[in-house]
């Protein structure tokens, strides 16, 4: 069979764009199959990238030469670092984006990607031979051959839009859903469910009374997502803050029965951490107000995205409650809000590569795996694209551990625990978050990316230059030291134990900055500012990271205890029916992964460990 493509990616959203670009960077002849070129890179919901936990994912995507960080930098019109007053481990870079600029930059980035073709059409069926995907069949009957395929359907998989009693089949407002592909996947026996998400009404900024609203300014020193972005060139704009009122809540309560979520029309679970305004009013009935961020959708666009009031109430009810909100008394609605319900596949159907267990060569990424958010989708797309290309080329799987990336945390959570509601990334999900900071994503991942072959020449050169500069700076610091008495003469407070301390160790002190040390040793002034900032962060965390390193090494020992594919869980006596069923379904690759399965007990882990050791001994 002549293979037209090595990898076919279905869908041109955030997951699909990253998957296609990643596969192509790996050298795979790649096709991005999308309904329309014009919709590639669309921001379907909020016009923003990053945030707490999410910003870490964007930096990790960038560290592996992905697109989202660079595209967000090209489109960003308000950059802010969330949690700036807290430690670097939990700071979240975020950017408000110009929708038009984002789509333009994403399409340009894909156009510049070698080995990548854009194909218009709707994926309708899979070609399967001997339990493996060999191609995609489009709705108009074209057969596209491939060695691996990545499905990134977002909310399109049998999507249905709800607004009051009005329903329509759609993947996004004004766009057809993927009905036949959903039927194909269901017919193949995948465990599927329904989830829902929502979006707020879009407002005409010219009809908003901005006087009296709180202003949210951008950071004075915008921090790019990408290490390849020298500076942010777009004008930076303000956002504004308003709030719901008692009158708003009364309108919503009086009409709650018209919400499809509360009328029973929608059965899918929505995202807990991004609830609709109806959910907020019902769940937090003691609150008289909820914050709303009025976010401009572009530099040359008067459309305003009111972040915080997604809704599926009827259009006339939306109009009524909007007019009870300060500043929106005479607002014109450009597009009413709505909820969308869609199919997802239980992510426990997946390996840690995001390849399905049922069909070889079929990878899934994004909302089809039960996640919510652009960043979560894009990160999965990157992982799926890398692994699809590796499989197509006969290479080894590319795995991300919990101890090395938020991407590893997310994938492990999905494939081990599954989802009952849309999954969102938070820093609190990572047990090693002191190591997994947004500022060191390149130090954690770019070296691995170079080995895998997904890093381009520009990033490779920039990374090597940065690492050399960091090494030089550390070398400079190691060349200077002080006794406690000498340190005291310079105003540095350390224990008077007679022990000399090097400059890097001194930098770890809470009240010591590199500027103080540069005053003592002027030679340190040759360290450039960006490297100096990184060195300071590394020094402040050094003691804690040394402790965490031991935990990580212990975890990696457990990860190295692999469970052979040949293990028959039905033959293991002493396991409960529930645990046996979960082990059969998930088929964990290691003892460490098995320990994270919901409901796993110490007794079950002991039995499993004994089995692994016995099988290992027999094989030797």
Curated annotation (Swiss-Prot):
Residues at which FAD binds: 11-16
Q: What SMART domains does the database record attribute to this sequence? A: GIDA_assoc_3 (SM01228)
The UniProt GO MF terms for this protein read: flavin adenine dinucleotide binding
Give the cofactors, semicolon-separated.
FAD
The protein's matches in InterPro entries, at most eight in alphabetical order, are given as: FAD/NAD-bd_sf (IPR036188), GIDA_C_N (IPR049312), MnmG (IPR004416), MnmG-rel (IPR002218), MnmG-rel_CS (IPR020595), MnmG_C (IPR026904), MnmG_C_subdom (IPR047001), MnmG_C_subdom_sf (IPR044920)
Membrane-crossing residue ranges in chain numbering: none
The record, for PROSITE patterns, names: GIDA_1, GIDA_2
Enumerate the residues binding NAD(+): 270-284
Subcellular location, record wording: Cytoplasm
Q: Does the keyword Flavoprotein apply?
A: yes
What cellular component GO annotations does this protein have?
cytosol
Q: Which UniProt keywords apply?
A: Cytoplasm, FAD, Flavoprotein, NAD, tRNA processing
Which GO biological-process labels does this protein carry?
tRNA methylation; tRNA wobble uridine modification
Protein's UniProt keywords contain Flavoprotein: yes
Pfam families reported in the protein's UniProt record: GIDA, GIDA_C_1st, SAM_GIDA_C
Q: How does it assemble?
A: Homodimer. Heterotetramer of two MnmE and two MnmG subunits.
**What NCBIfam families does the database record attribute to this sequence?**
mnmG_gidA
Function field: NAD-binding protein involved in the addition of a carboxymethylaminomethyl (cmnm) group at the wobble position (U34) of certain tRNAs, forming tRNA-cmnm(5)s(2)U34.
Tell me the HAMAP family matching this sequence.
Answer: MnmG_GidA (MF_00129)
Name the protein family.
Belongs to the MnmG family.
Full protein name: tRNA uridine 5-carboxymethylaminomethyl modification enzyme MnmG
Task: State the organism of origin.
Answer: Methylocella silvestris (strain DSM 15510 / CIP 108128 / LMG 27833 / NCIMB 13906 / BL2)
Its gene? Answer: mnmG
């Amino acid at each position: 069979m002549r293979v037209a493509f090595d990898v076919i990616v279905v869908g041109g959203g955030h997951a699909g764009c990253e998957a296609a670009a990643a596969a192509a960077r790996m050298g795979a002849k790649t096709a991005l199959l999308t309904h329309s070129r014009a919709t590639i890179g669309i921001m379907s919901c909020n016009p923003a990238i990053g945030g707490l936990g999410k910003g870490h994912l964007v930096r990790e995507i960038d560290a592996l030469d992905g697109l989202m960080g660079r595209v967000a930098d090209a489109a960003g019109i308000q950059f802010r670092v969330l949690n700036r007053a807290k430690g670097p481990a939990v700071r979240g870079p975020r950017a408000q984006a110009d929708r038009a600029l984002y789509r333009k930059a994403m399409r340009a980035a894909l156009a510049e990607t070698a080995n990548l073709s854009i194909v218009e059409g709707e994926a309708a069926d899979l070609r399967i031979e001997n339990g493996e995907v060999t191609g995609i069949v489009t709705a108009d009957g074209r057969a596209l051959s491939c060695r691996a395929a990545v499905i990134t359907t977002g909310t399109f998989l049998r999507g249905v839009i709800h607004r009051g009693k009005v329903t329509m089949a759609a993947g996004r407002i004004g766009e057809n859903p993927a009905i036949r592909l959903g039927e194909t996947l269901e017919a193949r026996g995948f465990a599927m469910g329904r989830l829902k998400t929502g979006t707020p009404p879009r407002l005409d900024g010219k009809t908003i009374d901005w006087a009296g609203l709180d202003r949210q300014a951008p950071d004075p020193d915008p921090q790019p997502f990408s290490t390849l972005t020298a500076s942010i060139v777009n004008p930076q704009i303000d956002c504004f803050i308003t709030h719901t009122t008692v009158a708003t809540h009364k309108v919503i309560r009086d009409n709650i029965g018209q919400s499809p979520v509360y009328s029973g029309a929608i059965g899918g679970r929505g995202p807990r951490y991004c609830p609709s305004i109806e959910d907020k009013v019902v769940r937090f009935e003691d609150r008289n107000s909820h914050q709303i961020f009025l976010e401009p959708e572009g530099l040359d666009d008067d459309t305003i995205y009111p972040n915080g009031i997604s809704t599926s109430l009827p259009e006339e009810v939306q109009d009524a409650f909007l007019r009870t909100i300060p500043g929106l008394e005479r607002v014109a609605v450009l597009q009413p809000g709505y909820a969308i319900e869609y199919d997802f596949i239980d992510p426990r159907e997946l390996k840690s590569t995001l390849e399905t267990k049922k069909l070889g060569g079929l990878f899934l990424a994004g909302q089809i795996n039960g996640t919510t958010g652009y960043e979560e989708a894009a990160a999965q797309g990157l992982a799926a694209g890398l692994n699809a290309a590796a499989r197509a080329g006969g290479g080894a799987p590319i795995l991300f551990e919990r101890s090395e990336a938020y991407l590893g945390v997310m994938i492990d959570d999905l494939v081990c625990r599954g989802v009952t509601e849309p999954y969102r990334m938070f820093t609190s999900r990572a047990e090693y978050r002191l190591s997994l900071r947004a500022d060191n994503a390149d130090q954690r991942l770019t070296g691995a990316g170079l080995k895998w072959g997904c890093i381009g020449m520009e990033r490779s050169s920039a990374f090597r230059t940065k690492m050399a500069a960091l090494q030089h700076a550390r070398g400079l610091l190691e060349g200077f030291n002080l006794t406690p008495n000498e340190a005291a003469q310079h105003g540095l407070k350390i224990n008077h134990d007679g022990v000399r301390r090097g400059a890097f160790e001194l930098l770890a002190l809470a009240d010591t900055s590199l500027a103080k040390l540069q005053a003592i040793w002027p030679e340190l002034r040759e360290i450039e500012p960006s490297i100096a900032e990184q060195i300071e962060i590394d020094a402040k965390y050094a003691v804690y990271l040394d402790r965490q390193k031991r935990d990580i090494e212990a975890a990696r020992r457990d990860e190295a205890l692999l469970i052979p594919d040949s293990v028959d869980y039905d033959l293991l006596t002493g396991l409960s029916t529930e645990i046996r069923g979960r082990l059969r379904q998930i088929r964990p690759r290691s003892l460490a992964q098995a320990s994270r399965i919901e409901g796993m007990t110490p007794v079950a882990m002991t039995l499993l460990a004994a089995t692994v050791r016995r099988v290992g001994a027999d094989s030797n």
